[in-house]
């Protein structure tokens, strides 16, 4: 106890000695905060964050279209990996700003956070861009940005780099028929990795999503870099029937429970809401998804508009069941109804409120009830217009509900009860915590790695499951093989959440599932087999964000009795160069043959300690096509695998050619 007080005293004295004065307060001006903390504005510095820059520029163009001022948007990906987005709208204002008389409005918008025309309803009734943050953030995080504005027979242009102005506003003569705004930019490799480039498929799908969200716009697509076989080099993208067209393109029509897509489109309401939706029910629950948008901005975390739709569908089916005397309908939940449903929802409202800068969840009050009333009214008409169709749908969702209810008694209410009921694998070193929150399961290969991991773990929160024998490739195996495989049996028993349609997140015994394999090629192969298992047998576990990859080191570098670790050859080279410049002392390099060769203390320090390790979260951008993607790469047909590798090689070769100094 005395040690505790002496420690606090020492700590207090250190704080007193450390003068905390005005000079310690940082004041970041202009776009400095964006470059210093990009994650606060775009959610990180990874590939998803970099593509968010494209979304911001495209959202601004879409705002012009939705407001009725633009009909064509052009997206062009260039050989140098820059991108140009043009809209034929009114063009950003170029006259001097009244608050900054020495600057054009264009320069103010590009260099000042929280500037723009979306703070009132005078310019845009509905808007999707980040209200004066989006384009200035793009400018701040771009190595180069050039903007062109066509207005009244003039072309106004200006160049920027990393948020700083390179040129004054230049005015030239141009055709009077041209109008609008063109923005070309290249993400800054100092912020994003030099290895990162725009993904043509991702941007093409983004363009498609914007086009179906607003029927009045045509998007011209052009890509100069190599594209996958399913992505065109050039295309005109337009969906005259909006969301219904889009949903039809995403599903297999002969796989529908009922042959009709329930869709609707309301242009305006007394609540000043524009609403569109499309819903269908399929035989395969792996095809289920919900995609929602507000003012063309994706809201992957849902929000009040989704709540309204869910309430409408649930109330509608329960009311129909009551009307025809089917008492089982009273037991329905929204999860039963949506288990095999594919849903697309779009809403346009004035002054939307989002959760966070990246706007992933709509939190606007006063949205849920109007959406519920509109969709409920249309759904009632949809069901009553075709009795056979409505009865088929009702019986389908009731069957799902009955299956859920039949399993209710088998559910493990707490993790403690689950542990008591399950005969856990003998090789599992379980953690002592009895609730899933904060717990982790490390999946390792063999006893050697398992032994080190068991000694390195935190026994309260970290469990270790060594897998014996060859990990099965479930993509090319029969159901009988999968069911009888010992490693898969052990894994499914340890997780306790079930698989495929029997998967239940509430039964999952751990918050994080971490695949921890050797840092070499063999380890990567085992990790790919395990990920294949999760993608095909437990895709919702991945979708819900429970699956991770550990990043153990491959090399150990020692200099002057100090130890450093590197994950791969490139990291080793950079670290060696850094250490050589800092000191002339000899650097000793050792290569780990595997996790089992590492001392428990090393494994804990580099790979397992939550505050010191680095984890990769496993995500999928296209859950609807996961079966096809995994089958192409991991399935029985080598020609599909060859095509996948060939397409990736083309992308890689394109990068290499563009980097050659010729």
UniProtKB/Swiss-Prot annotation:
Reaction catalyzed: ATP-dependent breakage, passage and rejoining of double-stranded DNA
Annotated positions binding Mg(2+) 2: 518, 520
A molecular-function term among this protein's GO annotations: DNA binding
Gene3D superfamilies: 3.30.230.10, 3.40.50.670, Histidine kinase-like ATPase, C-terminal domain
Amino-acid positions noted as binding Mg(2+) 1 in the UniProt annotation, renumbered to this chain: 445, 518
Cofactor(s) the protein requires to work: Mg(2+); Mn(2+); Ca(2+)
UniProt record similarity statement: Belongs to the type II topoisomerase family. ParE type 1 subfamily.
PANTHER family registered for this protein in UniProt: DNA GYRASE SUBUNIT B, MITOCHONDRIAL (PTHR45866:SF1), DNA GYRASE/TOPOISOMERASE SUBUNIT B (PTHR45866)
Name listed for the protein in its UniProt record: DNA topoisomerase 4 subunit B
């Amino acid at each position: 106890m005395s040690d505790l007080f002496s420690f606090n005293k020492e700590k207090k004295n250190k704080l007193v000695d450390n003068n905390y004065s005005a000079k310690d307060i940082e004041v970041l001006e202009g776009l400095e905060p964006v470059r210093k903390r990009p994650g606060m504005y775009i959610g990180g510095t990874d590939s998803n964050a970099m593509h968010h820059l494209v979304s911001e520029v495209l959202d601004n163009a879409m705002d012009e279209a939705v407001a009725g001022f633009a009909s064509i948007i052009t997206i062009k990906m260039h050989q140098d990996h820059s991108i140009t987005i043009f809209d034929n709208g009114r063009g950003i204002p170029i006259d001097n700003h009244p608050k900054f008389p020495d600057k054009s409005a264009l320069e103010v918008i590009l260099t000042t956070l929280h500037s723009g025309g979306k703070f009132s309803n005078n310019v845009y009734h509905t808007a999707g861009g980040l209200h004066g943050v989006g384009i200035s953030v793009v400018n701040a995080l771009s190595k180069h940005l050039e903007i062109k504005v066509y207005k009244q027979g003039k072309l106004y242009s200006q160049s920027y780099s990393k948020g700083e102005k390179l040129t004054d506003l230049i005015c030239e003569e141009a055709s009077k028929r041209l109008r609008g705004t063109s923005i070309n930019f290249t993400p800054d490799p100092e912020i994003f990795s030099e290895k990162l480039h725009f993904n043509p498929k991702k941007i093409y799908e983004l363009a498609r999503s914007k086009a179906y969200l607003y029927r009045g716009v045509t998007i011209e697509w052009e890509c100069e870099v190599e594209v996958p076989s399913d992505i065109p080099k050039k295309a005109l993208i337009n969906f005259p029937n909006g969301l219904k067209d889009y949903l039809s393109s995403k599903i297999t029509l002969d796989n529908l429970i009922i042959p009709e897509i329930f869709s609707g489109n309301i242009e305006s309401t007394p609540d000043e809401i524009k609403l569109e939706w499309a819903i269908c029910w399929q035989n395969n629950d792996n095809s289920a998804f919900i995609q929602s948008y507000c003012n063309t901005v994706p809201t992957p975390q849902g929000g009040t508009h989704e709540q309204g739709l869910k309430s409408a569908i649930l109330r509608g089916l329960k009311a129909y069941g009551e009307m025809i005397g089917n008492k089982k309908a009273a037991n329905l939940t929204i999860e039963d109804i949506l288990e095999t449903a594919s849903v697309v929802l779009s809403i346009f409202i004035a002054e939307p409120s989002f959760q966070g800068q990246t706007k992933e969840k709509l939190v606007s009050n006063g949205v849920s009830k109007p959406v519920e009333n509109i969709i409920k009214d249309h759904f009632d008409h949809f069901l009553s217009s075709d009795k056979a169709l409505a009865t088929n749908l009702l019986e389908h969702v009731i069957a799902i509900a009955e299956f859920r209810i039949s399993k209710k008694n088998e559910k493990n209410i707490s993790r403690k009860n689950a542990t008591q009921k399950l005969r856990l694998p003998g090789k599992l070193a379980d953690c002592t915590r009895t609730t899933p929150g904060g717990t982790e399961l490390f999946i390792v290969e063999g006893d050697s790695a398992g032994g080190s991991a068991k000694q390195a773990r935190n026994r309260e929160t970290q469990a270790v499951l060594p897998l014996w024998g060859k990990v099965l490739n479930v993509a090319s195996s029969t159901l009988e093989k999968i069911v009888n495989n010992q490693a898969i049996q052990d894994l499914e028993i340890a997780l306790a959440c079930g698989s495929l349609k029997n998967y239940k997140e509430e039964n999952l015994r751990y918050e994080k599932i971490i695949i921890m394999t050797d840092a070499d090629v063999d380890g990567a192969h085992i990790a790919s087999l395990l990920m294949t298992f999760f993608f095909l047998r437990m895709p919702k576990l991945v979708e819900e964000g429970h699956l991770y990859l550990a990043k153990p080191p491959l090399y150990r570098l020692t200099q002057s009795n100090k130890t450093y670790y590197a994950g791969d050859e490139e990291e080793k080279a950079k670290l060696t160069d850094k250490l050589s410049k800092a000191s002339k002392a000899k650097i000793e390099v050792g290569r780990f043959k595997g996790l089992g060769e590492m001392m428990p203390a090393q494994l804990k320090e580099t790979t397992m300690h939550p505050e010191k390790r680095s984890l990769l979260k496993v995500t999928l951008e296209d859950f609807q096509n996961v079966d096809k993607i995994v089958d192409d790469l991991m399935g029985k047909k080598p020609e599909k695998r060859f095509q996948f590798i060939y397409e990736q090689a083309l992308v890689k070769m394109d990068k290499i050619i563009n980097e050659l100094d010729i």
